[in-house]
Amino acid sequence: MKKTIKTLALFLLCLMCLILQASCSSDEEITDADANTELVKEATNYLNGEIVLRTNATMNGVNKTLLPEGCPTKFKFEWSKTDAQTFTISLLDFTVGNMGMIINFKCDVKTMVLNSWEQKEYTGDGWIKFKGEYGSVWGTDTDGSASSAKGSSVQGYYNAKTHEIQFIVNYNMMNVRSECFKQTIDKSRLATFDADKAKYEADLAAYKKEHGIK
């Protein structure tokens, strides 16, 4: 009897492992699938050109942006003319606070559907996922020396209905990342970008003075 119970328990354990493995494999296949074509079409009509977003820049895990509202950051989104599911994200001459480096970045990303775990976090209709690897980064250090790196990456989410967006750029250089926290795109920010950036720099200087940060 005990032997039968042990055999049954072992069988159930193996069955659970197989189900879990199949579920993970299926989820991975779903993640790699193209995003809904209608949502992608809607995305191309809005998520394109220069767009100003609020981001936090981190270096070695330390937030160099310092201010809770983040830094105005101008990204460019350009859709491929040959692959409807692909677009390029670029960022030119980016620096913030005391980061001590000017960064340029470009990466091709592919749109795809969300897996089951992501669907629980990004609820509602309209969400697509975008992911890219093997991007390029080049920049200038404070001493004027040039730097470059391969292998930068992007992963994020965009809602074609509400125009909410969230993504992280890993530059693969000096452990620097840009974190675009979830927000709704406001295209009017492009017209006020220079003024908003100047205000951010002034607020940052005041914050550093108040907290004794050099």
Regions found by a protein language model. Give the residues of each.
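Polybasic, proline/glycine-rich intrinsically disordered low-complexity segments
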Residues: 123-171, 176-191
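Bacterial Sec-dependent N-terminal signal peptides
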Residues: 1-4, 17-51, 171-214
